[in-house]
Design a protein with these regions (language model features):
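A conserved beta-strand/loop element that lines the FAD pocket in flavoprotein oxidoreductases
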Residues: 164-166
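Short boundary motifs at domain starts and secondary-structure transition points
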Residues: 1, 88-91
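Short alpha-helical segments and helix-capping/turn motifs at coil-helix boundaries
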Residues: 81-86
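Short glycine-/acidic-enriched loop or helix-start segments at secondary-structure transitions
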Residues: 18-19, 110
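Beta1/beta-strand and adjacent pyrophosphate-binding region of the FAD-binding site
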Residues: 1-14
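Gly/Ala-rich phosphate-binding loop of Rossmann-like dinucleotide-binding domains
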Residues: 19, 23, 90-92
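Glycine-rich active-site loop/strand segments that organize a redox cofactor
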Residues: 33-77, 91-158
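Active-site catalytic pocket residues across diverse enzymes, especially alpha/beta-hydrolases
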Residues: 22-30, 114
Length: 166
């Protein structure tokens, strides 16, 4: 029997994001960025090289949800930023031993949706942070608008490519 430090249940976007972190892809803040309050700005600067080390309770005390803290860096405006303007970057660190268990493969339940299915959000809101969907479109020769709704037939190959890139 194999033993692993972490078992991930499910290969959907959530499981893939956890897998990326366990594989060693960790965020950092870089360049010019601004948070809505000077107090949170100072907190972000303190943790810019390792945002995963911050105490989420400290954010909550300042009136900010932790998920919004990271979203403000990944998607600071409604439309997608060019990759060279991203202030959320990723560094490869040591991996943790992990195994993903899934019956659906990378993308999870998206593999079982109707072939005509579109998402309810733009492509760049469906991406997993360290592998931008715009980069996937370029690498696979897809001429797509990353601010438009993404089609299932683009999303599933993106999640599969994401898993392979881990």
């Amino acid at each position: 029997m194999q033993h692993h430090s972490v078992i991930i249940a499910g290969g959907g976007p959530g499981g893939l994001g956890v897998a990326a972190t366990l594989e060693g892809w960790h965020p950092r803040f870089e360049g010019e960025y601004e948070f809505p309050s000077p107090e949170v700005q100072q907190f972000a600067r303190k943790h810019e090289q390792n945002p995963l080390a911050l105490d989420p309770h400290e954010l909550l005390k300042r009136g900010h949800r932790p998920i919004e803290f990271f979203r403000m860096r990944h998607h600071p405006i409604q439309d997608a930023l060019p990759l060279d303007e991203w202030t959320l970057k990723f560094t490869k660190k040591n991996r943790t031993d992990w195994l993903m268990l899934t019956t659906d493969g990378p993308g999870g339940l998206w593999n079982n949706t109707p072939k005509e299915q579109m998402t309810l959000g733009p492509a760049h809101w469906m991406e997993l942070a360290h592998y931008p969907i715009g980069k996937f479109y370029q690498q696979t020769g897809r001429d797509r608008d990353i601010n438009a709704l993404v089609h299932r037939n683009d999303l599933i190959p993106y999640y599969q490519a994401f898993a392979e890139a881990l």
